[in-house]
Amino acid sequence: MSHQKESKRDNQHTDKEYVEKLVKLNRTAKVVKGGRRFSFSALTVVGDQKGRVGYGFGKANDVSDAIRKSIEKAKANMVTFPLKNGTIPHEVQGKFKGSSVLLRPACSGTGIIAGGTIRAIMEAAGATDLLSKSLGSSSAVNVVKATFDAASLLMDGKKIAKSRGKTLLDVWG
């Protein structure tokens, strides 16, 4: 019995190191014979503010269950954003269906200049300075997926040096 309590405490401790942000909560209604039956969908972003971030989409008949499911999926689908001094290393553009997201590095002190969806992702990732522009479709799900597509195109200094056949000092100077 006491062993189970310890493992529960460990799980609670790991939950506190993540920042959870609700991006979108949607209510849908199905009309049935007795009236309307509501269901909920939630889109959340989870990050450790050290460069690792993930997103999840959950559906349920209750708001709290939908949020819980989306957070679990977000923790399972974490990716790494290579951050350098609180910003991204270079400009990048990601696309998903009708949405396109442009991410640009910024000088320290600029802050995160972004819309709500991109801002939630970057704050969860731990970025402090960033410029962004969302183009095309403003659907929250599409913007999130376009942002993660942009993240997959980001290269840190080691990857850039390896692709050019140079050392890290040659690339960053």
From Swiss-Prot:
Keywords associated with the record: Ribonucleoprotein, Ribosomal protein, RNA-binding, rRNA-binding
Assembly and oligomerization: Part of the 30S ribosomal subunit. Contacts proteins S4 and S8.
Domain of life assignment: Bacteria
GO biological process: translation
Its biological purpose: With S4 and S12 plays an important role in translational accuracy. Located at the back of the 30S subunit body where it stabilizes the conformation of the head with respect to the body.
One GO CC term, this protein: small ribosomal subunit
Protein's organism: Treponema denticola (strain ATCC 35405 / DSM 14222 / CIP 103919 / JCM 8153 / KCTC 15104)
Domain S5 DRBM: 18-81
Family: Belongs to the universal ribosomal protein uS5 family.
A GO term for molecular function: structural constituent of ribosome
Matches recorded under HAMAP family: Ribosomal_uS5_B
Domain remark text: The N-terminal domain interacts with the head of the 30S subunit; the C-terminal domain interacts with the body and contacts protein S4. The interaction surface between S4 and S5 is involved in control of translational fidelity.
Name the UniProt record assigns to this protein: Small ribosomal subunit protein uS5
NCBIfam families for this protein: rpsE_bact
